């Protein structure tokens, strides 16, 4: 199963904590996160997915966007 973990770069801290918790719960059930590695909400979802080592597909506008690592989870357009 897939879910999109996206939102505002200006998401309040308490909401980002909830997003991280949700991503952890979904990750524990093997859901795959799709997101964009932007600050704020995207990063909160990504943190939750990373905590459970769950699958991710992170779509970047360019290589190393926001310091993204060069791993197969991080996708850059050709």
Language model features with spans:
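Acidic/glycine-enriched connector segments
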Residues: 1-4, 9-78
């Amino acid at each position: 199963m897939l879910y999109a973990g996206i939102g505002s770069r200006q998401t309040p801290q308490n909401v980002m904590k909830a997003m991280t918790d949700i991503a952890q719960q979904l990750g524990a059930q093997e859901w795959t996160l799709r997101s964009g590695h932007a600050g704020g909400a995207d990063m909160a979802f990504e943190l939750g997915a990373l905590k459970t080592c769950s699958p991710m597909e992170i779509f970047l506008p360019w290589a190393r966007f926001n310091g993204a690592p060069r791993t197969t989870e991080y996708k850059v357009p050709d």
